[in-house]
């Protein structure tokens, strides 16, 4: 690790701690050349494999932008979107795989979004599952109603 102050090519780790609920490691480092200290944060990169085969790092921001589009005009605040994105990231990381298909990210979005806002869920699902007719919407609405009945009967 290069020192950010003197650019020396070596540093010594003084302390390491888990942060972000175990998703990252915070390391306190010392430069043997200039003696200054600095902090690094290390995270494992989860890559998303798109349908085209292109691989890109998982992005909470991209999840939020996609869900925000589905929530347009709905009473959904930024905190709820951030929490949903965190849930999606946790689900993706829990798979324990270095690469996750974009399809799995979409599936990870559907569950929390259904709980957050049913209309936004229908909008997102209609694009994600490529609805082509009103029948597709009717089937999904019936599945939502069945899910609601099961949830309320508990």
Swiss-Prot record:
Zn-finger region bounds: unnamed: 3-34
PROSITE patterns xref list: ATP_CONE
GO molecular function terms listed in the Swiss-Prot or TrEMBL record: ATP binding; DNA binding; zinc ion binding
Keyword terms, alphabetized: ATP-binding, DNA-binding, Metal-binding, Nucleotide-binding, Repressor, Transcription, Transcription regulation, Zinc, Zinc-finger
Note on how the cofactor is bound: Binds 1 zinc ion.
GO biological process, one term: negative regulation of DNA-templated transcription
The keyword Nuclease appears for this protein: no
Keyword Manganese: no
Family: Belongs to the NrdR family.
Protein purpose: Negatively regulates transcription of bacterial ribonucleotide reductase nrd genes and operons by binding to NrdR-boxes.
Record's protein name: Transcriptional repressor NrdR
Organism: Mycobacterium leprae (strain TN)
């Amino acid at each position: 690790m290069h020192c950010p102050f003197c650019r020396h090519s070596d540093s010594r780790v003084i302390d390491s701690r888990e942060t972000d609920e175990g998703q990252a490691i915070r390391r306190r480092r010392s430069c043997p050349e200039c003696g200054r200290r600095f902090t690094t944060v290390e995270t494992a990169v989860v890559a998303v494999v798109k349908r085209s085969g292109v691989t890109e790092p998982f992005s909470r921001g991209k999840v939020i932008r996609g869900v925000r589009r589905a929530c347009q005009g709905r009473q959904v605040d930024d905190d709820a979107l951030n929490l949903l994105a965190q849930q999606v990231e946790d689900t993706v990381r829990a798979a324990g795989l270095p690469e996750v298909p974009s399809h799995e990210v979409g599936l990870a979005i559907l569950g929390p979004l259904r709980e957050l806002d049913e209309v936004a869920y229908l909008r997102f699902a209609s694009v994600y599952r490529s609805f082509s007719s009103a029948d597709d919407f009717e089937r999904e609405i019936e599945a939502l109603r069945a899910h609601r009945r099961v949830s309320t009967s508990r």
